[in-house]
Amino acid sequence: SPLSYSGGDTEYLTMLKELKPDAVIISTDWSTHAGIACDSMKHGAHAFVEVPLAVSLEELWNLVDTSEATRKHCMMMENVNYGRDELMFLNMVRQGVIGDLLHGEAAYIHCLVTQLGDTRGEGAWRPEYHTRINGNLYPTHGLGPVAQYMNLARGEDHFSRVAAFASPALGRNAYAKKHLPADHRWNNTPFICGDMNTAIVKTQLGRTIVVQLDETSPRP
């Protein structure tokens, strides 16, 4: 029967030492992704990491340095790149059906404010990032497929510049005030991440991509 390792935040290290796996799939909370990936590579395993791969530039460079030092692969598992619709369109692009791609638009838009009332699972930790960062917290679901369509970082074109702007942060504070007790943590911790974040990316060849994030606004 499959073995289970639990009971502490570092039990994965015991698993790495005892099982010596060839590869590790990491689907923990965001703050632990990079650290577990680096430890996995140092123990001889390839690391496959859920989105996002890391939450800081320092973590990203640690991943690069560790991968190069250990000669182990480290891949962010951006699952939307492999969706049926996305792969169909990628195939059409590569066959020349679509023509020259000059502009793309991508987004991660769906309402997650009900997570504010959760005490277990993703809702127990994910809202915290909306109190710490004002930016696009989750760009790659939309940006990943568009980057593939444009063949970015695979030859002559790549990301060159980005400008991002956020709306005011109103929705999460309003939801907490209406639906949660006055002494709840989310009524005593202000949210700073704008309800809508819009970024424009320019590539080296001058192509443009609009990327949006909105996990807060109520939508049908």
Model-derived segments and spans:
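Non-transmembrane alpha-helical segments in soluble domains
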Residues: 13-16, 38, 64, 90, ...
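N-terminal glycine-/serine-/threonine-rich beta1-alpha1-beta2 phosphate-ribose binding loop
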Residues: 1-45, 61-73
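Short, solvent-exposed turn/loop segments enriched in Gly/Ser/Thr/Pro and often Arg
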Residues: 29-32, 54-55, 80-83
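ADP-ribose/adenylate-binding Rossmann-like module
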Residues: 43-56
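Short catalytic-loop micro-motif centered on adjacent basic/acidic residues
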Residues: 25-26, 47-50, 74-78, 210-213
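NAD(P)-dinucleotide binding in Rossmann-like oxidoreductases
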Residues: 186-197, 201-220
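Predominantly a Rossmann-like dinucleotide-binding segment in NAD(P)-dependent oxidoreductases
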Residues: 70-75, 80-191
